[in-house]
Amino acid sequence: MADDFAYLNARVRVRRGTLLKESFFQEALDLSFADFLRLLSETVYGGELAGQGLPDVDRAVLRTQAKLVGDLPRLVTGEAREAVRLLLLRNDLHNLQALLRAKATGRPFEEVLLLPGTLREEVWRQAYEAQDPAGMAQVLAVPGHPLARALRAVLRETQDLARVEALLAKRFFEDVAKAAKGLDQPALRDYLALEVDAENLRTAFKLQGSGLAPDAFFLKGGRFVDRVRFARLMEGDYAVLDELSGTPFSGLSGVRDLRALERGLRCVLLKEAKKGVQDPLGVGLVLAYVKEREWEAVRLRLLARRAYFGLPRAQVEEEVVCP
């Protein structure tokens, strides 16, 4: 194993060659479910496609991504491993938040979009099957995951789902920012600063009208969303988004609902992450690849559902295309 990115980036370049082309997604927008399965079987996901149902597609996507992304930290040592681990820990946070929402709404585990992180599917399933969020923290504590400690601390403060998610993100990004500062990886630090901005925008939307104190939820370390803007957006002042012109978030001007915000943030972060291909000697190339695979998983699941339920193209097209 190497302790720098030369070996890892060589492997990542090969794996980027298996990313699905844009033509795949354009074709899939008009296919029946049977034809979608046929098309998917001809890709890198075909090896894990072991059935003809929607859960089989989800399983194939999850397991293929675990193989093509989840093993990246094991291919390197030292600072390189730590940098990659921090990237995948971000997906662990997404997965935990998604499971908390699923448990609260009665959504089945199979419907949860899990992103490739540092934990196996089996661990997330056990966490979902826990009796309550405290039980989920206990499951995550077995492999010594840092989110276990964070979740326990948050649950001592509140049981409200929106607040739990926001406080989890706050604790997570504070810890990750400290770890990233110790690494000589400017591409990673710059990207994580954008993630902090994105999380602040997301949290402000979720907590609008709550009357909660902004300081309890505002994340430090962003580049464009300061505490004042965060507080204003929590109060419903959408002019904050207009003030982000000239930043990577300029496309959010005019957004007024959480779903549109999430879609816009996803595209912004993807675009910024893909700039990492210009960082062949650092973590940037891995960052680009991880986010490209993540976006691929989101698109595949949405397109599978469009085909399975016979939804019109227009209903999902804007969800699977980033300008």
Swiss-Prot record:
One of its GO terms (cellular component) is proton-transporting V-type ATPase, V0 domain. Coiled coil: none annotated. InterPro entries: ATPase_csu/dsu_sf (IPR036079), ATPase_V0-cplx_csu (IPR014272), ATPase_V0-cplx_csu/dsu (IPR002843), V-ATPase_V0D/AC39_subunit (IPR050873), V-type_ATPase_csu/dsu (IPR035067), V-type_ATPase_csu/dsu_dom_3 (IPR044911). GO terms for molecular function: ATP binding; proton-transporting ATP synthase activity, rotational mechanism; proton-transporting ATPase activity, rotational mechanism. Keywords: ATP synthesis, Hydrogen ion transport, Ion transport, Transport. SUPFAM superfamilies: V-type ATP synthase subunit C (SSF103486). GO terms for biological process: proton motive force-driven plasma membrane ATP synthesis. Produces ATP from ADP in the presence of a proton gradient across the membrane. This is V-type ATP synthase subunit C. It comes from Thermus thermophilus (strain ATCC BAA-163 / DSM 7039 / HB27). The lineage of its organism: Bacteria, Thermotogati, Deinococcota, Deinococci, Thermales. The gene is atpC.
